Amino acid sequence: MGSKSIFNYRRGIFFGLIFLSIVIFFTMAHPLVPYDGDDWLNLSILRKAVPMTGAYNPIKVLPETLFPLSGLVAAYVVYPLVGDYISAISLTSALVMAGLISLYMYLFFKLVERWFSLSDYANMMVTALFFLFHFALFYEKSSPVPYLFGSGNLTCIYHYVIPALVNLCVVLYLASFDIAHEALNLTPGRRSVLLFCIYLAIFSNALSNIILAAYVGSVLVFKFFAHLKDHGGYKAFVKGNAFYIGIIAVWLLALVFESHGGRAHDIGRSMSLSGIGETGKIFLSMIGRISVDVAVVGVLTIAAALYSSYRKKDKGYLLIGMYLGTSLVSALYLLLVCAKASPGYIGRSDVFISFIIWTVLLMALSLAYVFKQYGKSVFVGPLLVLFFIVEVGLGGQGFAQSTMGSVPPSVCYEIDYNLIEQIQAADREGKTEMVLRVPKGDKHDNWPHPTYMGGKISRTFYKHGLISRNIKIKIQPDPAMNEQYHIAVPK
């Protein structure tokens, strides 16, 4: 009992450190601060928790329920404790991210444990490196570095990063059974939780749910050919894999829902070869931004794993086959969807993750395989962890901020409170209408503080208890605020 408690105690410390590091990262180093019109809209607008035909985002059940619920928790639970509204939103969002990322790392740890039976120490080294790869994957000398847990603003954290994390958690959980060739014989409670998570994963984002679909589709292809090899019938295959076939069917249904939504209608562009070509160029440019250090370590690790697998005549080729299958499906899907929507999407780390994560997983699992086959090689684990911790801290201009236009979070904080003070002053004076001064934005609609955001920010402040009534707000761009806060006017 003593050794087992120490074993669990070490794991608790390890994952506790991951959780704490993410909380610190997203509250102090790179705070998740609301800033633009989308943030103020999505903090309070709560949708039905089912896909809705004809809605602007028909299938975004996960982000469009979690974000406003987090906003309510921030306003009515965290805000009274910390005494700062914007900090409450930042802390709540950081806790959500820390919880999901910690779960993601734990499920990866359990997958490695189940597949390779590594020592606790070796598994922690592999998991720590897997965690660091999400930060060290890209490198830029002269501009802020993107990372796989980052995005363009707080809304996109909830709408892209979190859906990707939920999909990855489901994939890692399913993979722990598939690798062991075990059936999903779960208790009713666990089965219901799994189905709920699959529901949220599929009905989250059409650029993120490909993670689950690519994995399940690849598993089905492998099982199908194995079934044919055993001279099995089609009916038996369908019956034996009804669960995974059902996941693909629901995913396809979700795509149909999404294709008839308001956002798809607004895009209104047809697929074209030029669009696919432009998307492909941006896709290749993203690959070109991958850190040389990560690429070298990845190539050496994968090569060592392949060499060992070849010598031992084991089934390591199945992992490569799964990697190629998931990567190919994800790449083709993203190229086509982004070419239809906007080629620039694929140049975002929160979208590119749906493709590149398979390579990151292959690198980490290959390292685990090498540690399993060559026990003494574990000594390089701490060296690699230290190396990438240092690399993460050496980025040319640090990590990209999760704010629109990469405005420093401290400046966003000051502007937010300027807006809050203006609106609360009008509320104290009993006004039902007001003019809200905001920084001057772009020429189209004054983004990131668009002229149409007045009703949205008023509704959010009213729902969160900052004002006593809804106020009709007219947005007035003011260049003086740009000078005051040293922000450039967007072009």
Regions found by a protein language model. Give the residues of each.
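Membrane-interface micro-motifs in multi-pass membrane enzymes
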Residues: 122-176, 333-366
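Signature aromatic-anchored transmembrane alpha helix within multi-pass, membrane-resident enzymes
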Residues: 188-191, 244-248, 316-321, 369-397
